[in-house]
Amino acid sequence: MSWSAKQYVAFEEERTRPVRDLLGALPPIDARSVIDIGCGPGNSTEELAARYPRARAIGIDSSQDMIEAARARLPNIHFKVQDLNTWNDPGPFDVILANAVLQWVPNHEVLLPAFAAKLSPRGALAVQMPDNLGEPAHRMMREVAAAGPWASKLEHASKARTPLPKPEWYYAQLKPVCSKIDIWRTTYFHSLPGGPGAVVEWFKGSGLRPFLEPLSGEERSAYLERYTAEIAKVCLPLADGGVLLPFPRVFLAAIR
């Protein structure tokens, strides 16, 4: 699946706020080695480096486009294209940040203990994942996909992500390898100017990618037209013409 840094950063402030909230929950350790997994265009890496200014920061992402944007943004930080499934750097890292990436990756029962094993003693694992598959905006992606002439092409798109396990499950995975675990869930109400169309633009940078990529240009336009019409039914304009986008997110902050 390809990614567009330009599309993603169209709502950079809203996408970056959860990173700040997550990093703010970590202890003020004297970190010397930190890594941003799934760093995207570098907005989260910038926050990580600011939180731990004495540390050597690294950013990895599977998207060449994202890495190029991150390098342009932060030329003094080392970024590389790296598939998370084949990432084998043993560390140790004082902080591992995984912001809005693990929702795309299966086998959390394997990944999370493996990440914790890469931490230095008292190192921190910081994870943030969208938990919004049940929200109308995501439900409509699947409904429009199933109801259109593109249904066979998009059969697998609805399976690109699966619902997140419950907090108790994550606690059970981390408890054997971590001394302290904080888990919380927050719903942000992002204020987006531009009406329902802004919601569509938001998800074109994230959740819609698996649905749009398999389609031809003509099919893509038709899909987006139908999806926008459905979004307009539930994301009603506010008095100023904007909309509020409810966006639930799950946070994990664990200390080895």
Task: Provide a role label for each language-model segment.
Residues 14-32, 47:
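Conserved alpha-helix/loop element of class I SAM-dependent methyltransferases that forms part
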Residues 88-96:
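A short acidic, Gly/Pro-enriched loop at the edge of an enzyme's catalytic core
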Residues 109, 116, 122-194:
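Conserved catalytic/acceptor-binding region of the Class I
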Residues 27, 53, 71, 75, ...:
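Short conserved AdoMet
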Residues 33-89, 110:
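Class I SAM-dependent methyltransferase SAM/SAH-binding core
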Residues 41-43, 161-256:
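Conserved Class I S-adenosyl-L-methionine
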Residues 1-13:
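Class I SAM-dependent methyltransferase Rossmann-like catalytic core
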Residues 95-109, 131:
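A short SAM/SAH-binding and catalytic strip from SAM-dependent methyltransferases
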